[in-house]
């Protein structure tokens, strides 16, 4: 499609097969996958482009040190910090153009921390077991696209293959869109609104735009 590079963020000790499948699907679209390993305790189930050792080092603690007394409480913040530093740097340098990840509660928490550090408009797709409920803790105010995994992410099956293929298609499609956030020429005014104030907000926007301002509206709840 677009010849872009897509980050695949995954714990390769538990989701190596799924990450490899995502890589293959992304490559079918003519894009390149850059697999970042955020796993800790087990050997990676597929070859990473960015190793868990590199991620841990970027997070401020060597992997060997984490493995002396492995625990989620220690490992998760380090790997999240390391992955965030690596991916945001690559994005700022224009070397990656989208990110897709998959996980349960822990994987979603780690991966969306990385995603929330990326700019608005940068494609972010999170395949998650948690996406059928309240996703506010993971999305917050960022443009993270949450995709429900339907099944647990534990091996490949007909449903999981289709979901991951859809996720690859989604992130590659987003990365191929050439629309960018425009530089602002007019002063920008924020408006908050909710159902019963919609008409008033629309009138306020009309008046402001006629006066030479640009408006951006946020839902108040």
Segments predicted by a language model, with ranges:
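Conserved active-site and cofactor/substrate-binding residues in soluble primary-metabolism enzymes
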Residues: 14-17, 21, 74-82, 106-109, ...
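Glycine-rich phosphate/diphosphate-binding loop of Rossmann-like nucleotide-binding domains
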Residues: 15-27, 34-35, 40-53, 184-221
């Amino acid at each position: 499609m677009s010849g872009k590079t897509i980050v695949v963020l995954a714990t390769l000790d538990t989701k190596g097969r799924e990450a490899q499948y995502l890589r293959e699907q992304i490559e079918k679209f003519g894009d390149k996958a850059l697999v970042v390993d955020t796993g800790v305790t087990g050997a990676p189930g597929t070859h990473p482009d960015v190793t868990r050792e590199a991620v841990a080092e970027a997070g401020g603690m060597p992997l060997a040190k984490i493995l002396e007394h492995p625990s989620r409480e220690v490992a998760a913040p380090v790997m999240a910090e390391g992955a965030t530093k690596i991916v945001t740097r690559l994005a700022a340098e224009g070397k990656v153009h989208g990110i897709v990840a998959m996980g349960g509660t822990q994987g979603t928490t780690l991966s969306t921390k990385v995603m929330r550090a990326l700019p608005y408009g940068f494609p972010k797709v999170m395949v998650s077991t948690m996406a059928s409920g309240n996703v506010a803790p993971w999305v917050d105010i960022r443009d993270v696209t949450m995709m429900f995994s339907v099944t647990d992410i534990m091996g490949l099956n007909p449903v999981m293959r289709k979901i991951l293929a859809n996720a690859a298609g989604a992130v590659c499609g987003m990365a191929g869109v050439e629309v960018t956030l425009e530089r602002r020429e007019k002063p920008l005014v924020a408006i908050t609104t909710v159902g019963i104030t919609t008409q008033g907000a629309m009138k306020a926007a009309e008046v402001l735009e006629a006066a030479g301002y640009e408006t951006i509206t946020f839902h108040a709840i």
